[in-house]
Amino acid sequence: MDVSAPLGLLAELTHRCPLHCPYCSNPVELTARRDELTTGQWLSVLDAARDLGVLQVHMSGGEPLLRPDLPELVGRASDLGCYVNLVTSGLGLTPSRLAGLVDRGLAHVQLSMQGADAARADRIAGARAHDRKLEAATAVRAAGLPLSVNVVLHRANHDQVGALIALAERMGADRLELANTQYYGWALRNRAALMPTREQLAAAEPVVRAAAERLRGRMEIVYVVADYHERYPKPCMYGWGARQLTVAPGGDVLPCPAASAITTLPVENVQRRSLSDIWYHSESFNAFRGDGWMRDPCRTCERRSVDFGGCRCQAFLLTGDAAATDPVCSLSPDRGVVADIIATESDVDTPFVMRGPAAVR
């Protein structure tokens, strides 16, 4: 099949993070600081990505501001002609630090928020962070950069959807993404504590719809549904190895940020193989491209080019088979697995297991 060049690179510069969010989708086993790619290696990755056709670079983590070479990496990506987006907790994003990044070509900031007020947000983040995030947002707007606010929704903050929208308005956000938790990595460990109730989901959707209509043309609102409760799966990555690739802190190259969960796939790394060769020719990137890998019901389903069989990582985590129909799909023979999870986990009083920093020091 014909393979197009990727549009975007998610550069996960580090797994280190000042927050301890229970919904973190990074792997349970994090990359230690000593095993992160060096500055020179990241510069080579950026060069190779641009040669491959990448136009957007999203610098993320962990917390990318913990890399002292961040201005150099932003500058290289910008000099190559890429649109550079910083995905950050905001901790450490002072006006002077931001000015240095803007001077090097930073074009956009995505800022995570955990709740609509400091008490709730700081409890979820496991750190006193909320007020510092608001200061970071003020700095972004003062610098003239577009601001996106990202909120991961779960049982502990779903009742704040309306207040979160109002908060994003006050922050001057251009875009608000309200994304229900995806259960990968550390978040999977906390699924029973994170899964919202049906009542919470039903209450949130009309609030989001009304706000999206009211704010049309002023603030874009993107609502990512809780796919466990949907009839069909989300079109994960708009197809495996189709639009974007991820380079993890240690150089592993992934078709999606959570793909390391599929332990049956070989792991490619930029230290052993070129980015171009990985994108076009590796087993891991070609495993689920197109629809030739599909089995029924996906193979003969009219939605196979709409949702692409759903999420490969979710299929593997719930069934042990990455080629299975995503079990959140109502047509999946494994839908009962998801129904049982909803029945047993969506309304139990389970405490968070907070993410700790020790593994990445």
Indicate where each model-derived feature is located:
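Radical SAM enzyme [4Fe-4S]-AdoMet core and its adjacent flexible, acidic
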Residues: 37, 83, 99, 103-104, ...
